[in-house]
Amino acid sequence: MKTPFTILAALTVATTLADVPDEWDIIELSFGEPTSVDSGEIKFAMCPKTECPNVESEEEFKAAIKAKRAKGKKVLLSIGGQNGQVQLKTTEARDKFVSSVGGIIDKYGLDGLDIDFEGHSLYLDQGDTDFKNPKTSVVVNLIAALKSLKEKYGKAFVLTMAPETFFVQLGYSSYGPSNGNDARAGSYLPVIHAMRDDLTVLQVQNYNSGPIIGLDDQYHNVGTPDFLIAMADMLKAGFPVAKTNNTFPPLREDQIAIGLPSTVSAGNGFVDEKGVQDALNCLMKGESCGTYKPRGGKSPSFRGLMAWSINWDKFSNWGFLNPHRKYLDSFP
């Protein structure tokens, strides 16, 4: 059975959940943040009334989550973001992460978790060169924590990840601190690889990124269909990490979504409606491709799109959601 096309998006608590259109399939509540960088304890709070006069009460919020889930939508807790650095350096922090995240999921009746670790949350120690057998504590402990949560909640647990390109596709040319490189380069790869059998969607942020080398060994820049195609194709085709003989295996096409800013103001790398749909046509049908030709073949079951964010799109009168929902729904 074919996986339905999906449109995902982050929702900050400044926007009322009950008012989110049902065309969004997966809603990621942003953000759960740590009490300190290395505590492992995650907190999630409603927007203060001083900032959000129309914010729901906690009971209204829980009811809205229940109503969305009753319609088949998935509501997740998104952890991290630009300001939410999380470093699970110790087993104590790992265990606190598991217990606190589980507590939030249980309290609100959520479907799962989105990992949006940015900044210096993940990195690789010197000598940690094999993504299949990581040694760095912040990586090893995150993997163990995610496996514990998956085991606790079972098959229905939804797990998504929203890394930046620096932590994923950059791993084709640079991995970890070897040769004087940034220790964070490619550091999501061991997490993705370890969780690939349990990963629902990988939605790499195709914005706020520097140029990235694709499988054609050419630099690609944000804001173009070629960038979207090249970055998604690396995940579908797989790639040799740091150009060695250690290959990151392909993900299933239904695990891959393209992360985009929903408006020009939401992030550097906005792509207009035609550009996004040209990229999807190329990936799914092998049509409308630009200079980059996918190595991974056609992906008719490609998962869809992720937007940052519902809030931004609301202020643009759903300029992202409406045309792309219609486009994806036009496929059989």
Swiss-Prot record:
SUPFAM superfamilies: (Trans)glycosidases. GO terms for biological process: chitin catabolic process; polysaccharide catabolic process. It is an enzyme of class 3 (hydrolase). GO terms for cellular component: extracellular region. It is found in: Secreted. Keywords: Carbohydrate metabolism, Chitin degradation, Glycoprotein, Glycosidase, Hydrolase, Polysaccharide degradation, Secreted, Signal. Glycans are attached at N245. The active site is at E118 (proton donor). Belongs to the glycosyl hydrolase 18 family. Chitinase class II subfamily. This is Probable class II chitinase ARB_00204. It comes from Arthroderma benhamiae (strain ATCC MYA-4681 / CBS 112371).
